[in-house]
């Protein structure tokens, strides 16, 4: 299940943590944009998402500043390719920024002409996996047209991180449900699948019913603060297994320090928290 990525190491001084945390922290789910378009991109995305506030400037440098201040040891950029033909430029930009502590996934669009070629390029560039967003990319994870992507990622041992559940910037019906991710994991048992937003944003009852216990990872991004019943978070973690839950923020849409505090304040054991904040990501990406 876990892949090896040689050559990753902790940067000097990054092991230092703030007083409220004695744990190493890796954020598997952040977003950055080129400096020239970061401000306009955040303004556009916020406007279409009920004026959702942002907590960084959306640039690599500002994310680094906030992350180190909050005690993070590392973080993952998750670019979304929103149009066919963009993958080459997006992935080249991401690869230029894929250096510890700031790692990066790559991206592919379901309508790209050479899907397998794009996925191979992501591997050849040394990127850490592939990010997908069924709403922004308008596809369902079980559609036959994306099957070659899953097959190739499984073959090349590239983890995939997929948006889960509803999206504040879109209207229903949504493209994929927790049961679809469960089926995807059944079809591709060797594929490392990470479902964002604890398996399905605002679909957490369905996550408990259809996805908990399956061969997938769940990330915590943009989830806990929206859950009316906080005990459901703990219940999902315990039933699914803390060894299959990864810490994420969806930065710039969540304050980095607050996100750590939200998760660390839950009634989980120290070992469970260490798995979520660091150990599980370290096993996947071998750092």
Model-derived features: positions:
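Mid-to-C-terminal alpha-helical segments outside catalytic/metal-binding sites
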Residues: 4-7, 19-31, 35-70, 74, ...
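Active-site environment of divalent metal-dependent phosphoester hydrolases
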Residues: 33-36, 82-85, 111-114, 137, ...
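A general structural detector for well-ordered alpha-helical segments in enzyme core domains, enriched
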Residues: 62-66, 90-97, 117-122, 145-149, ...
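Active-site neighborhood of phospho(di)ester-bond hydrolases with catalytic His/Asp-centered motifs
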Residues: 25-28, 78, 105-106, 131, ...
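Active-site gating/metal-coordination segments in enzymes
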Residues: 20, 73-74, 84-168, 172-175
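Conserved, mostly hydrophobic/aromatic
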Residues: 29, 94, 130, 153, ...
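Catalytic pocket-lining loop regions of alpha/beta-barrel enzymes
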Residues: 128-129, 142-246
